[in-house]
Each structure stands twice: as C-alpha cells, then as structure tokens.
C-alpha cells in the first residue's frame, strides 16, 4: 500500500509539473507557471527514489502504468474531458502490467 501511495503522489507531481509547461506554452499562461512546475518535477524525481527496488528501471517500468491511469484521471478531473472506454481499457491493461512487475516473484 505504501508503494502505491508513493506512485500516486509521484504521478500527481509529474503530471502537475508537465501541465505547468503545457499551460505556459499551449494555454498562454504566464511564464511564472514554470516555477511550481519545476518544483513539481523535482518532487516527482525525488519521490521515485523512495520506492524499494533493486533496480531503477523496474521502478520506472512499474510507474508507467500508474502514470497512464493518473493521466486519464487528470484529463477527467482537471481538464473536464471524460476518458472513453478505449482509454479506460488501455489503462487497465497497463495497471495489470504494473501489478505483475511490483508483485512478481524474484
């Protein structure tokens, strides 16, 4: 459960940081959006180091599924665009992969 909470916080930090750049470049927001965006991206990188694993690549691979699902949640909550059934199905496949990577016997 702790691992999932860290992955969820990591996804929020990364998506918020990337959205700050999106807002600046695509939505004509102030360049000052980059200040919290950069802080969020630094937090994202730090949070990934808190995951217990013998390899960074495995952490990043497992995180990928969480990121995909969290991005679709962001699309819905922050941007007001509801994911379609293809989005949801794709995210579920990725989350199955995440569980296999995290819980697989080593």
From Swiss-Prot:
Coiled coil: none annotated. InterPro entries: UPF0060. The chain crosses the membrane at residues 4-24, 31-51, 59-79, 85-105. Keywords: Cell inner membrane, Cell membrane, Membrane, Transmembrane, Transmembrane helix. It is a multi-pass membrane protein. GO terms for cellular component: plasma membrane. It holds the Pfam family UPF0060. It is found in: Cell inner membrane. It comes from the Bacteria. The keyword Membrane applies. NCBIfam families: PRK02237.1. Belongs to the UPF0060 family. This is UPF0060 membrane protein Plav_2230. It comes from Parvibaculum lavamentivorans (strain DS-1 / DSM 13023 / NCIMB 13966).
